[in-house]
């Protein structure tokens, strides 16, 4: 007899519970205003984000996949270019690279930081 255990892809319940009191009023404001695309909350987010990271501008995206694609486009990555990326990542990382026609080059990660480092790329 085999017992099958299902591991959820991504469980954000615990994280959501800690942020619920911040998230729900904003969602209500957006629903009440009917500004589902762009609108004042997006402009506010972009202003706060650019100030937070010290840039002139920030751009809110519909998804992390869109953000990765736009970043590659902003860097003028072309079809056939190689892009180094971590081997321990969400599948959208490689997907954005392939979508633009580039080639993902998988690099190992540092076991403590889980990031690509100069040592893991070499």
Predicted features by range, described:
Residues 1-74, 78, 100:
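Conserved PLP-binding active-site segment in aminotransferase class I/II-type PLP enzymes
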Residues 73-122:
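PLP-dependent aminotransferase-like
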């Amino acid at each position: 007899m085999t017992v099958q255990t299902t591991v959820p892809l991504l469980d954000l319940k615990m994280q959501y519970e800690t942020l619920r009191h911040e998230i729900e009023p904003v969602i209500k404001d957006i629903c009440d205003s009917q500004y589902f695309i762009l609108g004042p909350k997006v402009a506010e987010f972009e202003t706060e984000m650019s100030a937070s990271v010290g840039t002139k501008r920030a751009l809110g995206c519909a998804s992390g996949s869109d953000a990765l694609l736009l970043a590659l486009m902003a860097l003028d990555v072309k079809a056939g270019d190689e892009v180094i990326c971590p081997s321990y990542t969400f599948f959208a990382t490689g997907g954005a690279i392939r979508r633009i026609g580039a080639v993902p080059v998988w690099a190992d990660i540092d076991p403590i930081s889980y990031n690509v480092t100069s040592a893991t790329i070499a």
